[in-house]
Design a protein with these regions (language model features):
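Juxtadomain coupling helices with adjacent low-complexity linkers
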Residues: 91-133
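Short acidic, glycine/proline-enriched loop segments that cap or flank alpha-helices
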Residues: 4, 69, 99-100
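Intrinsically disordered, low-complexity terminal regulatory regions
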Residues: 1-30, 122, 126-127, 131-133
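Short hydrophobic beta-strand micro-motif common in sensory/regulatory domains
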Residues: 76-86
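Regulatory sensory and allosteric helical modules in signal-transduction proteins
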Residues: 24-78
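Glycine-rich, often proline-containing surface loops adjacent to acidic residues and nearby aromatics
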Residues: 25, 87-91
Length: 133
């Protein structure tokens, strides 16, 4: 839980992130920031990131037909980063404006996601759904 709290807090305060969602084994572990309470179901973009184990950056969601996948986080997010936790989950970060995330924001998210994945795999982070904070 501390890992989820610390990492999501840092993303929301040190990057242009407006919302953070952590998905692990088909369960939403964390919703934080400006976020709706609609059920989140991973769509084609999230599943592709998990399958390929590569971060997907939607710098301007208005240009992507699959953007509705993220409306369950927050309607009309202008930018989205989907960072896989292997093939079992993902950290999804919504940004305040189009093209708001820098390369260093993306690298920081990838580093934290690797650390979070390791913690989840060894059971240090217990998967209990969390309300937004």
């Amino acid at each position: 839980k501390q890992e989820l709290a610390w990492g999501s807090h840092m993303l929301l305060t040190a990057t242009p992130a407006a919302s953070v969602l952590v998905l692990w084994r088909q369960e939403v572990l964390l919703r934080r920031g400006l976020i709706s309470q609609e059920p989140f179901n991973p769509g084609a973009i999230t599943l592709r990131a998990m399958e390929r184990e590569q971060t997907i950056s939607l710098v301007n969601t208005s240009l992507f037909p699959g953007r509705a996948e993220f409306d369950a986080m927050l309607q009309a997010l202008p930018a989205v980063l989907v960072c896989p936790l292997g093939q079992q989950g993902a950290v999804i970060v919504g940004g305040w404006s189009p093209r708001c995330f820098s390369r260093s924001d993306e690298r920081w998210l990838e580093g934290w996601s690797q650390r979070l994945r390791t913690s989840l795999e060894v059971g240090e982070v217990h998967p209990h759904p969390s309300d937004s904070a």
